[in-house]
Amino acid sequence: MSTKYKTTLAVLAGVALGAVAMQGLHAQAKPKAYTVSELETLDAAANAAFVPVIQAAQKAAGGRPLRTGGGKIVAMEGAAPKRVAITEWDSLEQAQAFYKSKAWNDLTPQREKAVKTIRRYVVEAVN
């Protein structure tokens, strides 16, 4: 085999491998998602017991609790909610699956004693 032929084959192989690698990287690049729960505490003691339980359930499902209600909420436009909980997920589908899961449904009695949900939604982080 001539050197020119070997070089051409090597370049073509490199291009093919690079294309396959880029395809794989592109397929994995799903945007993260965030659930935002606007809440009102109904019972402080029940809420204190509920927070670690819900965080453990979210973590078991792949979620990462970012904010669980403490700290200031400053209204920029409109009224600020009394309490906000934010959880990061690897994808919109992962967040939706958790909120349709048995683990979430099993927490309903405890959750309903602790907090009143004003609004809950999922935001997909797309650049």
Task: Kindly label every feature range from the protein language model.
Residues M1-L12:
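Bacterial N-terminal signal peptides that target proteins for export
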Residues A13-K100, V123-N127:
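Short S/T/G/P-rich N-terminal loop/turn motif that feeds into the first structured element of a domain
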Residues L66, L107-T108:
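Short, hydrophobic secondary-structure boundary micro-motifs
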